[in-house]
Amino acid sequence: LQGGMLEMHQTTFGGLAALFGPAQVLDLPYTFADDAVAECVMDGPLLAEMGKSILDQGLGLRLMAVGNTGGWRSFATTRQRIQSPADLARLRIRTLPSALEQEMVRELGGSPTPLPWSEVYYALSAGLLDGTKNSVQDVVGMKLHEHIRFLLVDRHSYMGSMWWYSEKQWQTL
């Protein structure tokens, strides 16, 4: 996208954090009380300023739209129910490569395991992961429920979606 080979791409808030650290603020656990609050933030000046800052820094990305990718992140596990933070002790939980997401799992006693989304199904089926942090829609859509036995609907993170256009392509329009 930055080089102009792709015109558009979608990232989550957490995914953007690998490129633009300040985006992590959008992925702080339990920041948004509900959809209405999250949508108010997404439609407000914070996201507009973030998009402008990314463009001004020359990262080659132009923010086009912000939405939701399918709900809220919650913990889903293969072998044990989570009723307290102690239940996460030593569990290998899939995270994004975001330092914030990894630190959250670590602080709860789990073992953060950054893994590409395309590898999560296999990792759960092979026992390489004990759980993940995804929305119910993601769990069902990727058939993770075939291996997931427990779901703690804690809604710790709003799964915001940002649609980006290549600045290189934009300049050719």
Residue ranges of predicted features:
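Contiguous mixed-secondary-structure segments that line small-molecule binding/active-site clefts
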Residues: 7, 12-111, 123, 144, ...
